Amino acid sequence: MKSSRTRRIRVPRQAGFTLAEIAIVLVIVAFLLGGMMSMFSAQTDQRKWNDTQSQLQAARDAVLGFTVANGRLPCPANSTSAGAEVRVVATGVCGAVGNAQDYYGGVVGGVTYGLLPAVTIGYQPVDSQGFALDAWGNRLRYAIARVTTPSTGTPSANFTYASNMKTNGISYLPNDLVVCASATGISAGPPGSCGAVATNSVTNQKTVVAIILSPGKNGVGQTAPGTDEIQNGNTAGANNPVFISHTPTPTGATNGEFDDQVLWISVGTLYSTLIAAGLLP
């Protein structure tokens, strides 16, 4: 009788990853994920930038629509007005008791600067307090020319007073708001000036009647704003009609980080809109 023998079947071993190989794979995955996150973040920022630009344009259209309906530009809102303009009805002067309002409080003379009066002009959407926000959740800001040339005529308000606008006509030009390419060499005024270097002037003092501005992704009140963004911030009590507008720059740029988005209404656009509506001869 033959004895049976147990036959052993060899199973080939499956090759596994060594610790070094796993580490390499993890590094590659982390690199790819980091690149994807960076790309996603950049795409998100670009989308929000585009959305904000559209919001600024819509706000501009709403301001001009209000102007056609009322024969004047709206005054700025302030941080306590729930999105309504702050204006002395009898004189057309922007601000309570004749003082201009800005984001941080009152400004006497110069430019009437504050927040977009979204409720007054019928702009949507607004937040629960009545303020228009950019795509990053910052309140849209709004400045308007106060000083004119010639400077005669009473009451003093022109662009925010329908009766004066009609009486003075298109011969009256703004003489304070100015947009510059850099804060270097500027003079606050009023009237404001971009300085002696001609290429620093984006507009002159007789061009801009209103400015609508988003403080961008880094918002208002950042810990270390660049000099260009400081200029657009106009801290409490500043009597400063100069604004800066240029392409975004990083923190290491000469005048620091800048991501504000600035849009303005020219006096030519204002007058042509009113003429087309039959409100000016």
Where are these regions (language model features)?
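N-terminal pilin/flagellin-like segments and related low-complexity appendage regions
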Residues: A42-P281
